[in-house]
Design a protein with these regions (language model features):
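Active-site beta3 strand of CheY-like receiver
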Residues: 50-56
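C-terminal output helix
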Residues: 108-121, 125
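Active-site residues of response regulator receiver
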Residues: 14, 58, 88
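Two-component/phosphorelay signaling modules centered on CheY-like receiver
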Residues: 5, 16-35, 41, 47
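Receiver (REC) domain active-site loop signature in two-component systems and cognate sites
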Residues: 61
Length: 134
């Protein structure tokens, strides 16, 4: 893996520990992984001095769902450019369309295929690197 990809940071946001574990294992060794179990913590980490390069975001979470988190992140100049991939059990076309409407760059339904997650994350990280270098 090219060095510029290995230094990239991924934030996994899900209220279920097992989902975080599965996603973390799929990406471990390729990226620096951090996680949040709720939307407020995700927003805090995304706005930190070392923001993630990409966010994997569940939709169905208590208190603040993934749509609200995405809307909030896209509203602020410091976080609006972070690519967000929804990873969710919500598989209806309406839900997927809604996710893109909130600013997500991709939408993956559970149960996940680790190889597909790896490929999509890599693609969006590479696109972000190209945009950052323009």
């Amino acid at each position: 893996m090219p060095e510029e990809l290995a230094s990239r940071r991924i934030l996994i946001v899900d209220d279920i520990s097992q989902n975080i574990k599965v996603l973390g294992e799929a990406l471990r060794g390729e990226y620096t992984i951090s996680f949040a179990k709720d939307g407020r913590r995700a927003i805090e980490l995304a706005g930190s001095e070392t923001p993630p390069d990409l966010i994997l975001l569940d939709i169905m979470m208590p208190e603040m769902d993934g749509y609200e988190v995405c809307r909030e992140l896209k509203r602020h100049p410091n976080t609006c450019e972070i690519p967000i991939i929804f990873i969710t059990a919500k598989s209806d076309v309406e839900d997927e369309t809604k996710g893109f409407g909130f600013g997500a760059v991709d939408y993956i339904t559970k149960p996940i295929n680790p190889t597909i997650v790896q490929a999509r994350v890599r693609t969006h990280i590479e696109l972000k690197l190209h945009r950052d270098n323009l």
